[in-house]
């Protein structure tokens, strides 16, 4: 979303019928912590029609409107490597954007969140559990969750303890974080991780197509 006109057009749709309920929930989260930031969910996603939830840890820098090239949106079209890798995997698997929706386990932007030590990070994960169930409750067609990274996977385990019936009803797929730290390695390593991501996303595509 490096072109501001395109960004503004997309932002104009944040209360479109398919994402209205989710983004109104985002508004309630923003009101709870007015000094902090939660990105709206991009209307490129299927919103209430989504069958696949893309679960990452927390908003990236490019979700912030004030950031250079920022969109103010949770979107796989954001101009950062983490979003680009997920977008590429979705395209490779033939998953339409309207078949999925993104969410951050801790939805507020926290600078450097991914590098926090466990004792500083885990309270955020505990808080995210009860927020995630509110999101899933707004996704009646949800079939699967794709988790990116160790920290949101830990959050999912906490979620499973609190909401076992909901967790059991969903097929779960996993991959490392697609951000710069998650893909820190040699060219050969990054290519292997990319291949693994494609394979896992293909499996997710098969499940949501059933």
Question: What role is predicted for each listed range?
Answer:
Residues 91, 165-204:
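Short, flexible loop segments at boundaries between secondary-structure elements
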Residues 206-210:
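A charged, well-structured terminal subsegment
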Residues 1-163, 169-176:
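A polyanion-binding, active-site-adjacent surface
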